[in-house]
Amino acid sequence: MAKTDGQQSGGVDARLAGAVLTVDLAALQANYRLISNRLTGGATASAVVKADAYGIGIGPAAKALWAAGARDFFVAHADEGVTLRGHLTDARIHVLNGAHDGAEDAFLEHGLIPALNCLGDAARWRAFCAQAGKPLPCVLHVDTGMCRLGLDRREYARVVADPSLLD
């Protein structure tokens, strides 16, 4: 709902801003539940809250989604994951851009789960787990045709032919 006549919304004068966005967190929760309740076969819904929850605020959005039942959250970068961890201590937080070389310790410290986007990521994560002395969670990201992130067809075929590449 836009505020007018100088009404304040979050410290913003709507007359000067041109428009003010009001986020209905109850609607966000209802939408999550709607999707989640339609899933079958053990599938679960996740919440993508990258880029400050697409500009609506990672803290309020994530807390609302957690209250609605979300347990898996995705962010783009590790710094977003660290911020999210400050709001949700028990959530599973996945980082779509993975653990960049040298950032692995932060993943362990903050309980972040990297997406492995190529076989090089898998090898680096495997080496870090060996150094840490224990297996650590990760997810495998496969490019589904958008050509952004994830194993391409050739790498995917290599993994299918030799699953030990992910050991």
Regions found by a protein language model. Give the residues of each.
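N-terminal amphipathic/basic leader segments beginning at the initiator methionine
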Residues: 2-17
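Active-site-proximal beta-alpha core segment in soluble small-molecule metabolic enzymes
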Residues: 13-15, 19-22, 27-29, 43-167
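Conserved PLP-enzyme active-site core in the AAT-like
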Residues: 38
